[in-house]
Amino acid sequence: MTKKAKNVEKVPFEDAMKRLEEIIDLMNQPTTSLEASLALYEEADQLMRICESRIQEVEARIKQLSDQRSES
């Protein structure tokens, strides 16, 4: 895993979402080059995977807590 990828994994969920919005804005600018767009796309892909993983972790934890409450 690259250094950049490791740094992306440490980004808080809210910051990752904010960065994804920034990437969308940058990619929609006509001055963004093809190469820059590709790099932004790759960064966005990493951020989306991390966000999806964190959402799944939270959903699993909520289900676990709900199940525990139901058993009580």
From Swiss-Prot:
Its EC number is 3.1.11.6. One of its GO terms (biological process) is DNA catabolic process. It is an enzyme of class 3 (hydrolase). One of its GO terms (molecular function) is exodeoxyribonuclease VII activity. GO terms for cellular component: cytosol; exodeoxyribonuclease VII complex. Its main location: cytoplasm. Pfam families: Exonuc_VII_S. Keywords: Cytoplasm, Exonuclease, Hydrolase, Nuclease. It is found in: Cytoplasm. It catalyses: Exonucleolytic cleavage in either 5'- to 3'- or 3'- to 5'-direction to yield nucleoside 5'-phosphates. Belongs to the XseB family. Bidirectionally degrades single-stranded DNA into large acid-insoluble oligonucleotides, which are then degraded further into small acid-soluble oligonucleotides. Heterooligomer composed of large and small subunits. This is Exodeoxyribonuclease 7 small subunit.
